[in-house]
C-alpha cells in the first residue's frame, strides 16, 4: 500500500519522536511527537522568541491555531499565558495534551480549525467561549497547494502544511473572520502570523493593511534554501 492515506495510517505504528526542545528562555520542554504531527522547527523557535519579547503573560489569554506538538503553547503557558490551542489533526491534539501533562502545564484544547467559509460552528463555539483573546498566533500552513497530478502528502499532513486551495489563503480567511467577529480579539490585542516568501505570503501584510489593520514585522529568519520566514503582528 503506497498511497499517502495508507502511508499515514501505517505510520501511526511507528515510535514517536522523542525530543527535548529548548525554548527562547532556555527552558527544556520534553516532547513526544507522532508521525504526521508537526514538530518544533525554525519557525516555531522564531514565534516563541517573538512571544517572549512581549513579556510574561500575567494571565492574559492566548490562542494558538495549529498547535502541532504543543511546544509553543506549553512554552507560553510556562510564561504566564492562559492558553487555548487547537489543531485539525486529531493526533496533534492528543500529542499536545500528553506533552502538556508531561510538562505539568494546563491548556484548553480542542480539535478543529478554520474552514474556507468560516462556517465551522464547533470551532467558532470554542473561539467565542474561550475568548476574547489578547494574542492569537498561527504558524500558517505555507506550502503552495499541489497542482493537479502532482504528488500529495497524506490527508493529515496536507491539512496542516498546505495553504488553502481556494482564492484566499488561510491568513486572509482569518482576517475575514476577525473582521466579521471583532470581539474575538480583545481591545488592544494582537495577532501574530508567520508567512513565507511565496506569492501569497508576500502579499499577506498588504492584504491586512487594506482592511485597515496596522502591521509590523516582529521577526524574520532566512533559511539555507533561500526561504524567508516572516512573523508580523496586526
Segments (PLM) and residue ranges:
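SAM-dependent Rossmann-like transferase core, predominantly class I methyltransferases
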Residues: 2-79, 95, 115-119, 217, ...
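A short helix-to-beta-strand connector/capping loop
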Residues: 26-27, 103-107, 213
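Short alpha-helical
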Residues: 39, 90-91, 199-200
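Conserved SAM/SAH cofactor-binding pocket of Class I
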Residues: 45-149
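Glycine-rich, phosphate-binding/catalytic loops in enzymes
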Residues: 79, 152-156, 208-211
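Short aromatic-enriched loop/helix-cap "lid" or pocket-rim segments at secondary-structure transitions
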Residues: 121-122, 147-152, 204, 228-229
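Mobile active-site "lid"/loop adjacent to the S-adenosyl-L-methionine
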Residues: 140-173
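Conserved Class I SAM-dependent methyltransferase catalytic core
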Residues: 169-231
